[in-house]
């Protein structure tokens, strides 16, 4: 008695279809599907820069060759 059976859901669905009409429900479903698709594409675009940043990250255990172009004296480094 506490939970709704399949018959309750079918009656609710029938009433909703009668109130809104099938064309309006179809439009709402299409809009909802487009919104979900746009959300998924946005999530993929948001994850792309993070993946690129991980690829550009320097290796932690490897040596990195660098070349200094100009030496600047630090404060307290007098000769």
From Swiss-Prot:
Pfam families in alphabetical order: TatA_B_E
Compositionally biased intervals (Basic and acidic residues): 66-79
Domain of life: Bacteria
GO molecular function, one term: protein transmembrane transporter activity
GO terms for cellular component: TAT protein transport complex
Location of this chain's protein in the cell: Cell inner membrane
GO BP: protein transport by the Tat complex
Protein name in the entry: Sec-independent protein translocase protein TatA
């Amino acid at each position: 008695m506490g939970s709704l059976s399949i018959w309750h859901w079918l009656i609710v669905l029938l009433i909703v279809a009668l109130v809104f009409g099938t064309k309006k429900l179809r439009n709402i479903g299409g809009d909802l599907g487009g919104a979900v698709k746009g959300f998924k594409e946005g999530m993929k675009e948001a994850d792309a820069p993070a993946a690129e940043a991980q690829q550009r990250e320097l290796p932690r255990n490897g040596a990195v060759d660098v070349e200094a172009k100009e030496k600047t004296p630090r404060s307290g480094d007098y000769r």
